[in-house]
From Swiss-Prot:
Gene name for this UniProt entry: mraY
Transmembrane segments: 23-43, 79-99, 103-123, 135-155, 186-206, 218-238, 258-278, 282-302, 307-327, 362-382
Name of protein: Phospho-N-acetylmuramoyl-pentapeptide-transferase
Coiled-coil annotated spans: none
Swiss-Prot/TrEMBL catalytic activity: UDP-N-acetyl-alpha-D-muramoyl-L-alanyl-gamma-D-glutamyl-meso-2,6-diaminopimeloyl-D-alanyl-D-alanine + di-trans,octa-cis-undecaprenyl phosphate = di-trans,octa-cis-undecaprenyl diphospho-N-acetyl-alpha-D-muramoyl-L-alanyl-D-glutamyl-meso-2,6-diaminopimeloyl-D-alanyl-D-alanine + UMP
Family according to the record: Belongs to the glycosyltransferase 4 family. MraY subfamily.
HAMAP family listed in its UniProt record: MraY
BP term (GO), one: peptidoglycan biosynthetic process
GO cellular component terms attached to this protein's record: plasma membrane
Protein species of origin: Salinibacter ruber (strain DSM 13855 / M31)
Pathway: Cell wall biogenesis; peptidoglycan biosynthesis
EC number: 2.7.8.13
InterPro entries found in the cross-reference section: Glycosyl_transferase_4, PNAcMuramoyl-5peptid_Trfase, PNAcMuramoyl-5peptid_Trfase_CS
One Pfam family in the UniProt entry: Glycos_transf_4
Cofactor(s) this protein requires: Mg(2+)
Length: 385
């Protein structure tokens, strides 16, 4: 809200220097500083409160006694995603143009999935049910958020000009149109029949993939910080007419305001990493993982760059794929031979490397490096076409 207040004062009294508040880059920097400050400042108190409430991580017996022992992590405060949500929400509300459709939709997507994650963490930590929220309820919450995001992106007037189009990597002057019914010329708008399921799938898949990645100290936090840095560049370029023309990508008026939101996400991740880095003094839990997945998924959809996701978020993709491959192959071999076999020693992928003897800090660092490289590659694709 400070943005509107300072802008009002500038228009009314014209004090020197106040006009800089209209620059997105300035507000993105201020949002970053604010989010980082909230995460670092409030983090210690929130962690202390979580510990007092005995909202600690529950380690399954198999994890405590198996080849990979996480017994030492039992009791570490979880639900730390509250820190991330407060940091991003506070910074964006202060410095963002919250009336902008892109901004409030991002906040709703992140907050909505954060609520779903909080419910899951609550069942685990307060009710002491290790499996957490019923899987169907969890998926229903993710689908509901996805449907809301998809409906706004398709039916809201601000998106009418390009509601079913998306960027195609490597191909110049080409876009993908999700409206597969357009060529039929029926005179009836049926594009939503394809677009809404696509949005629901992406929001659900990304949030689950981020959640699967959250298994080692600092892994999801660091990976998402790098992914968010890439998104900062994507949203700023998409909202800037000159840069969009130079890079020959779709110019999406208004998306520049998302820079403030994504910058806050990036800074909040770095602030949370202060406490979540190895050895972690707090875990984000599903509260943070699903919220970050909602932020990444909704943002990439809004700037029409979702086809870059497998590269931009390659660690998320690899973690989710490892679980799918492991589960599918185990069921297939058990049905064929009576004995289930595994492709990986453990899944998700980070546990496979743990089982091979790599220290979790080394695994985390290498996954960060891989993410940094693929984020740079994804940004280069904007130019190399």
């Amino acid at each position: 809200m400070l943005y509107y207040l300072i802008d009002y004062i500038e228009r009314l009294y014209h004090p020197p220097g106040f006009q800089v508040i209209r620059f997105i880059t300035v507000r993105a920097a201020l949002a970053s500083i604010t989010a980082l400050g909230i995460a670092l400042g409030a983090g210690r108190g929130i962690i202390r409160w979580l510990r007092q409430q005995q909202l600690g991580e529950q380690v399954r017996e198999g994890e405590a006694a198996g080849a990979i022992s996480h017994a030492h992590k039992a009791g570490t405060p979880t639900m730390g995603g509250i820190i991330i949500l407060l940091s991003v929400g506070g910074a964006t509300l202060l410095w963002g143009a919250v009336a902008n459709t892109y901004v409030w939709l991002s906040l709703v997507a992140m907050g909505g999935l954060g609520v779903v994650g909080f419910a899951d963490d609550y069942v685990k930590t307060v009710r002491k049910q290790k499996d957490g929220l019923n899987a169907w309820y969890k998926v229903a919450g993710q689908v509901a958020v996805g449907l809301f995001v998809g409906s706004v992106l398709y039916f809201h007037p601000d998106f009418a000009a390009y509601n079913t189009f998306t960027f195609i990597p490597f191909l110049k002057d080409q876009v993908l149109d999700y409206d597969l019914f357009r060529f039929l010329e029926l005179g009836v708008d049926l594009g939503w029949l394809v677009y809404l399921p696509v949005v629901v799938f992406i929001v659900t898949a990304v949030s689950n993939a981020v959640n699967l990645t959250d298994g080692l100290d600092g892994l999801t936090t660091g990976v998402t910080a790098f992914v968010s840095l890439g998104l900062v560049a994507l949203v700023y370029v998409s909202g800037n007419a000159e840069f969009a023309t130079f890079l020959n990508v779709m110019h999406l008026p208004g998306t520049g305001e998302l820079t403030v939101f994504v910058a806050a996400v990036t800074a909040a991740c770095f602030g949370f990493l202060w406490y979540n880095g190895y050895p972690a003094t707090v875990f984000m839990g599903d509260t943070g993982a699903l919220a970050l997945g909602g932020a990444v998924g909704s943002t990439i959809l809004m700037v029409r760059k979702e086809l870059l996701l497998p590269l931009l978020g390659i660690v998320y993709f690899a973690e989710a794929l490892s679980v799918i491959v492991q589960t599918s192959y185990f069921k297939y071999t058990r049905r064929r031979t009576g004995t289930g076999k595994r492709v990986f020693r453990m899944a998700p992928l980070h546990h496979h490397y743990e089982a091979r003897g790599l220290h979790e800090a080394k695994i985390v660092t290498r996954f960060w490096i891989v993410t940094a490289i693929t984020v740079i590659a994804a940004l280069l694709i904007l130019r190399i076409r």
